[in-house]
Design a protein with these regions (language model features):
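A cross-family kinase active-site recognition segment
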Residues: 94-155, 175-177, 205-206, 254, ...
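Short, surface-exposed acidic
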Residues: 16-20, 149-153, 245-253
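A general structural signal marking secondary-structure boundaries and capping sites
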Residues: 64, 111-118, 145, 220, ...
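ATP-binding pocket architecture of kinase catalytic cores
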Residues: 23-24, 28-127
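Juxta-kinase regulatory segment immediately upstream of eukaryotic protein kinase catalytic domains
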Residues: 1-18
Length: 298
Protein backbone atom coordinates (compact mmCIF):
# COMPACT_ATOMS: atom_id res chain seq x y z
CA UNK A 1 0.00 0.00 0.00
CA UNK A 2 1.17 3.55 -0.76
CA UNK A 3 1.38 4.81 2.83
CA UNK A 4 2.66 8.26 1.86
CA UNK A 5 -0.12 8.71 -0.66
CA UNK A 6 -2.70 7.37 1.79
CA UNK A 7 -1.53 9.78 4.49
CA UNK A 8 -1.88 12.75 2.14
CA UNK A 9 -5.28 11.56 0.93
CA UNK A 10 -6.54 11.14 4.50
CA UNK A 11 -5.38 14.66 5.38
CA UNK A 12 -7.26 16.02 2.39
CA UNK A 13 -10.46 14.81 4.06
CA UNK A 14 -9.88 15.18 7.81
CA UNK A 15 -7.45 16.84 10.24
CA UNK A 16 -5.66 14.22 12.37
CA UNK A 17 -4.49 15.35 15.81
CA UNK A 18 -1.83 12.67 16.18
CA UNK A 19 -0.10 9.85 14.42
CA UNK A 20 -2.06 7.65 12.04
CA UNK A 21 -1.62 4.05 13.19
CA UNK A 22 -2.17 0.66 11.62
CA UNK A 23 -5.12 -1.05 13.28
CA UNK A 24 -4.73 -4.32 11.38
CA UNK A 25 -3.39 -5.78 8.16
CA UNK A 26 -5.14 -8.65 6.41
CA UNK A 27 -4.63 -10.14 2.95
CA UNK A 28 -7.92 -8.53 1.86
CA UNK A 29 -7.55 -5.10 3.54
CA UNK A 30 -5.40 -2.81 5.66
CA UNK A 31 -7.12 -0.58 8.23
CA UNK A 32 -5.61 2.56 9.77
CA UNK A 33 -6.91 4.49 12.78
CA UNK A 34 -6.94 8.25 12.32
CA UNK A 35 -7.19 10.21 15.62
CA UNK A 36 -9.43 13.26 15.41
CA UNK A 37 -10.40 15.98 17.85
CA UNK A 38 -13.85 14.45 18.15
CA UNK A 39 -12.80 10.79 18.21
CA UNK A 40 -11.43 8.83 15.27
CA UNK A 41 -11.84 8.06 11.61
CA UNK A 42 -10.97 4.79 9.94
CA UNK A 43 -9.10 4.37 6.66
CA UNK A 44 -9.39 1.12 4.74
CA UNK A 45 -7.31 0.07 1.73
CA UNK A 46 -9.00 -2.88 0.04
CA UNK A 47 -7.20 -5.62 -1.87
CA UNK A 48 -8.32 -6.28 -5.46
CA UNK A 49 -10.64 -9.09 -4.34
CA UNK A 50 -12.66 -6.51 -2.37
CA UNK A 51 -12.02 -3.44 -4.52
CA UNK A 52 -15.77 -2.92 -4.93
CA UNK A 53 -16.25 -2.15 -1.23
CA UNK A 54 -15.53 1.62 -1.18
CA UNK A 55 -18.04 2.41 -3.90
CA UNK A 56 -20.65 0.02 -2.49
CA UNK A 57 -20.31 1.51 0.99
CA UNK A 58 -20.57 5.05 -0.36
CA UNK A 59 -23.68 4.15 -2.34
CA UNK A 60 -25.31 2.57 0.71
CA UNK A 61 -24.43 5.54 2.90
CA UNK A 62 -25.98 7.93 0.38
CA UNK A 63 -29.29 6.08 0.69
CA UNK A 64 -29.16 4.81 4.29
CA UNK A 65 -27.06 7.29 6.30
CA UNK A 66 -28.51 6.00 9.56
CA UNK A 67 -27.70 2.32 8.87
CA UNK A 68 -24.10 2.28 7.64
CA UNK A 69 -20.99 4.12 8.79
CA UNK A 70 -20.51 7.71 7.66
CA UNK A 71 -18.38 7.83 4.51
CA UNK A 72 -15.94 10.73 4.76
CA UNK A 73 -14.27 9.92 1.47
CA UNK A 74 -13.69 7.13 -1.02
CA UNK A 75 -11.48 6.52 -4.04
CA UNK A 76 -12.79 3.85 -6.41
CA UNK A 77 -9.60 3.64 -8.47
CA UNK A 78 -7.34 2.99 -5.48
CA UNK A 79 -10.03 1.13 -3.50
CA UNK A 80 -9.66 3.43 -0.51
CA UNK A 81 -12.36 4.22 2.02
CA UNK A 82 -12.48 6.67 4.93
CA UNK A 83 -15.21 6.19 7.53
CA UNK A 84 -16.38 8.11 10.54
CA UNK A 85 -16.49 6.36 13.87
CA UNK A 86 -19.63 4.23 14.20
CA UNK A 87 -19.52 3.53 17.92
CA UNK A 88 -19.12 0.16 19.61
CA UNK A 89 -19.56 -3.29 18.07
CA UNK A 90 -22.45 -5.16 19.66
CA UNK A 91 -20.09 -8.07 20.25
CA UNK A 92 -18.62 -5.99 23.07
CA UNK A 93 -21.85 -6.73 24.92
CA UNK A 94 -21.74 -10.47 24.20
CA UNK A 95 -23.78 -10.64 20.97
CA UNK A 96 -27.20 -10.37 22.66
CA UNK A 97 -29.99 -11.76 20.48
CA UNK A 98 -32.27 -8.94 21.66
CA UNK A 99 -30.20 -6.46 19.65
CA UNK A 100 -30.68 -8.52 16.50
CA UNK A 101 -34.45 -8.15 16.88
CA UNK A 102 -33.87 -4.49 16.03
CA UNK A 103 -30.93 -4.85 13.63
CA UNK A 104 -32.36 -7.49 11.31
CA UNK A 105 -35.51 -5.63 10.18
CA UNK A 106 -33.41 -2.52 9.53
CA UNK A 107 -31.02 -4.59 7.45
CA UNK A 108 -33.90 -6.25 5.57
CA UNK A 109 -35.34 -2.85 4.68
CA UNK A 110 -31.96 -1.83 3.28
CA UNK A 111 -31.83 -5.01 1.21
CA UNK A 112 -35.30 -4.42 -0.17
CA UNK A 113 -34.37 -0.89 -1.15
CA UNK A 114 -31.24 -2.10 -2.93
CA UNK A 115 -33.16 -4.43 -5.25
CA UNK A 116 -33.51 -1.48 -7.62
CA UNK A 117 -29.72 -1.09 -7.72
CA UNK A 118 -28.72 -4.73 -8.19
CA UNK A 119 -27.59 -4.46 -11.80
CA UNK A 120 -25.60 -1.33 -11.01
CA UNK A 121 -23.81 -3.11 -8.17
CA UNK A 122 -22.97 -6.04 -10.46
CA UNK A 123 -21.63 -3.65 -13.10
CA UNK A 124 -19.30 -2.15 -10.49
CA UNK A 125 -17.79 -5.42 -9.34
CA UNK A 126 -19.94 -6.71 -6.51
CA UNK A 127 -19.59 -10.51 -6.84
CA UNK A 128 -22.40 -12.35 -8.59
CA UNK A 129 -23.68 -15.19 -6.41
CA UNK A 130 -27.23 -15.18 -7.68
CA UNK A 131 -28.85 -18.52 -6.98
CA UNK A 132 -29.11 -19.54 -10.64
CA UNK A 133 -25.30 -19.30 -10.90
CA UNK A 134 -24.56 -21.50 -7.89
CA UNK A 135 -24.86 -25.01 -9.41
CA UNK A 136 -22.09 -24.21 -11.90
CA UNK A 137 -19.94 -22.84 -9.07
CA UNK A 138 -20.61 -25.86 -6.85
CA UNK A 139 -18.04 -27.94 -8.71
CA UNK A 140 -15.31 -25.64 -7.37
CA UNK A 141 -15.97 -27.09 -3.91
CA UNK A 142 -14.87 -30.49 -5.23
CA UNK A 143 -11.37 -29.39 -6.21
CA UNK A 144 -8.54 -31.50 -4.76
CA UNK A 145 -6.97 -28.47 -3.05
CA UNK A 146 -10.10 -27.80 -0.97
CA UNK A 147 -9.16 -28.51 2.69
CA UNK A 148 -11.42 -31.52 3.27
CA UNK A 149 -11.02 -35.25 3.66
CA UNK A 150 -11.70 -37.38 0.60
CA UNK A 151 -14.92 -38.80 2.01
CA UNK A 152 -16.19 -35.28 2.69
CA UNK A 153 -15.56 -34.27 -0.91
CA UNK A 154 -17.32 -37.46 -1.99
CA UNK A 155 -20.37 -36.42 0.05
CA UNK A 156 -20.39 -33.05 -1.65
CA UNK A 157 -20.05 -34.67 -5.07
CA UNK A 158 -22.96 -37.02 -4.41
CA UNK A 159 -25.12 -34.09 -3.29
CA UNK A 160 -24.53 -32.01 -6.45
CA UNK A 161 -27.72 -33.08 -8.29
CA UNK A 162 -29.83 -32.38 -5.21
CA UNK A 163 -28.15 -29.00 -4.75
CA UNK A 164 -29.16 -28.02 -8.26
CA UNK A 165 -32.75 -29.01 -7.48
CA UNK A 166 -32.72 -26.90 -4.31
CA UNK A 167 -31.43 -23.90 -6.25
CA UNK A 168 -34.18 -24.33 -8.83
CA UNK A 169 -36.77 -24.48 -6.05
CA UNK A 170 -35.41 -21.32 -4.45
CA UNK A 171 -35.35 -19.41 -7.74
CA UNK A 172 -38.96 -20.47 -8.39
CA UNK A 173 -40.10 -18.64 -5.25
CA UNK A 174 -39.16 -15.41 -7.03
CA UNK A 175 -37.78 -13.40 -4.13
CA UNK A 176 -35.81 -10.54 -5.67
CA UNK A 177 -32.06 -10.90 -5.31
CA UNK A 178 -30.10 -8.01 -3.89
CA UNK A 179 -26.99 -7.09 -1.95
CA UNK A 180 -26.28 -9.42 0.94
CA UNK A 181 -23.54 -8.74 3.47
CA UNK A 182 -22.27 -12.33 3.98
CA UNK A 183 -20.43 -11.40 7.19
CA UNK A 184 -23.33 -10.14 9.28
CA UNK A 185 -22.21 -10.87 12.83
CA UNK A 186 -21.67 -9.07 16.10
CA UNK A 187 -18.29 -7.55 15.11
CA UNK A 188 -19.78 -5.79 12.10
CA UNK A 189 -22.87 -4.19 13.66
CA UNK A 190 -22.12 -1.08 15.73
CA UNK A 191 -24.21 0.91 18.15
CA UNK A 192 -24.03 4.57 19.10
CA UNK A 193 -26.66 7.03 20.25
CA UNK A 194 -29.45 4.52 19.80
CA UNK A 195 -28.49 3.81 16.17
CA UNK A 196 -27.35 0.48 14.77
CA UNK A 197 -25.03 0.54 11.76
CA UNK A 198 -23.69 -2.27 9.58
CA UNK A 199 -20.01 -2.01 8.64
CA UNK A 200 -17.48 -3.96 6.58
CA UNK A 201 -19.24 -4.69 3.28
CA UNK A 202 -16.18 -6.29 1.65
CA UNK A 203 -17.61 -9.82 1.70
CA UNK A 204 -20.86 -8.76 0.06
CA UNK A 205 -22.38 -10.30 -3.02
CA UNK A 206 -25.55 -10.13 -5.06
CA UNK A 207 -27.56 -13.18 -4.07
CA UNK A 208 -30.75 -14.29 -2.37
CA UNK A 209 -31.27 -11.83 0.49
CA UNK A 210 -32.13 -14.42 3.11
CA UNK A 211 -28.74 -16.17 2.90
CA UNK A 212 -27.25 -13.31 4.93
CA UNK A 213 -28.49 -14.96 8.10
CA UNK A 214 -26.34 -18.06 7.61
CA UNK A 215 -23.50 -16.14 9.25
CA UNK A 216 -25.67 -14.34 11.80
CA UNK A 217 -27.17 -17.58 13.07
CA UNK A 218 -23.81 -19.36 13.08
CA UNK A 219 -22.34 -16.78 15.44
CA UNK A 220 -25.40 -16.88 17.67
CA UNK A 221 -24.75 -20.61 18.01
CA UNK A 222 -20.99 -20.37 18.50
CA UNK A 223 -20.63 -17.15 20.52
CA UNK A 224 -23.97 -16.71 22.27
CA UNK A 225 -24.20 -20.51 22.58
CA UNK A 226 -27.82 -20.75 21.55
CA UNK A 227 -28.54 -24.41 20.79
CA UNK A 228 -29.99 -25.27 17.36
CA UNK A 229 -33.75 -25.10 17.67
CA UNK A 230 -33.69 -22.43 20.36
CA UNK A 231 -36.86 -20.28 20.12
CA UNK A 232 -34.68 -17.23 19.57
CA UNK A 233 -33.92 -18.36 16.02
CA UNK A 234 -37.61 -18.37 15.08
CA UNK A 235 -38.09 -14.96 16.70
CA UNK A 236 -35.14 -13.51 14.80
CA UNK A 237 -36.25 -15.12 11.55
CA UNK A 238 -39.70 -13.58 11.94
CA UNK A 239 -38.23 -10.16 12.76
CA UNK A 240 -36.06 -10.32 9.66
CA UNK A 241 -38.88 -11.52 7.41
CA UNK A 242 -41.40 -8.90 8.53
CA UNK A 243 -40.32 -6.31 5.91
CA UNK A 244 -40.47 -8.98 3.21
CA UNK A 245 -44.07 -10.05 3.83
CA UNK A 246 -45.99 -13.02 5.17
CA UNK A 247 -45.70 -16.74 4.55
CA UNK A 248 -41.98 -16.90 3.78
CA UNK A 249 -40.86 -19.27 6.53
CA UNK A 250 -40.37 -22.25 4.19
CA UNK A 251 -38.53 -20.10 1.67
CA UNK A 252 -36.29 -18.89 4.47
CA UNK A 253 -35.45 -22.46 5.50
CA UNK A 254 -34.63 -23.34 1.89
CA UNK A 255 -32.49 -20.22 1.50
CA UNK A 256 -30.55 -21.05 4.66
CA UNK A 257 -29.81 -24.51 3.30
CA UNK A 258 -28.65 -23.21 -0.08
CA UNK A 259 -26.90 -20.32 1.65
CA UNK A 260 -24.52 -22.59 3.53
CA UNK A 261 -23.07 -23.63 0.16
CA UNK A 262 -23.15 -20.10 -1.26
CA UNK A 263 -21.14 -18.95 1.76
CA UNK A 264 -18.56 -21.68 1.15
CA UNK A 265 -18.33 -20.69 -2.52
CA UNK A 266 -17.73 -17.08 -1.46
CA UNK A 267 -14.95 -18.17 0.88
CA UNK A 268 -13.36 -20.12 -1.96
CA UNK A 269 -13.34 -16.97 -4.06
CA UNK A 270 -11.41 -15.18 -1.30
CA UNK A 271 -9.04 -18.13 -0.92
CA UNK A 272 -8.14 -18.10 -4.60
CA UNK A 273 -6.63 -14.63 -4.13
CA UNK A 274 -4.31 -15.70 -1.29
CA UNK A 275 -0.72 -16.91 -1.31
CA UNK A 276 0.08 -20.47 -0.26
CA UNK A 277 1.23 -19.23 3.16
CA UNK A 278 -1.90 -17.16 3.67
CA UNK A 279 -4.11 -20.09 2.68
CA UNK A 280 -2.73 -22.22 5.49
CA UNK A 281 -4.18 -19.91 8.15
CA UNK A 282 -7.32 -19.16 6.12
CA UNK A 283 -8.14 -22.85 5.77
CA UNK A 284 -8.66 -23.30 9.51
CA UNK A 285 -11.79 -21.17 9.30
CA UNK A 286 -12.67 -22.41 5.82
CA UNK A 287 -12.94 -26.01 7.04
CA UNK A 288 -15.60 -24.96 9.52
CA UNK A 289 -17.56 -23.20 6.77
CA UNK A 290 -17.26 -26.22 4.49
CA UNK A 291 -18.33 -28.66 7.17
CA UNK A 292 -21.37 -26.60 8.03
CA UNK A 293 -22.29 -26.87 4.35
CA UNK A 294 -21.67 -30.61 4.36
CA UNK A 295 -24.08 -30.90 7.30
CA UNK A 296 -26.79 -29.65 4.92
CA UNK A 297 -26.34 -32.72 2.70
CA UNK A 298 -28.10 -34.95 5.22
Amino acid sequence: MDLVGADAWIRDHVEPIGGIETEHERPWATVLRVPLAGGAAWFKACAPVQAFEPRLTAELFSRYPDRVAEVLGHDEERAWLLLGDAGTPIGTFGNPPETWLVALPLYAELQRGEVAHTLDHLAHGVPDLRVATLPARYDDLLRPDVPLEREEIDRLRAFAPRFEELCDELVAHDVAETVQHDDLHMANVYTEGGKLRVLDWGDSSISHPFVSLVVTFRFLEEVTELPPGDPWFARLRDAYLEPWGRGLEEVFALAMRVGAFAHAIAWLRQRDHLSAMERSEFDRGFRTVLRRAIAQTL
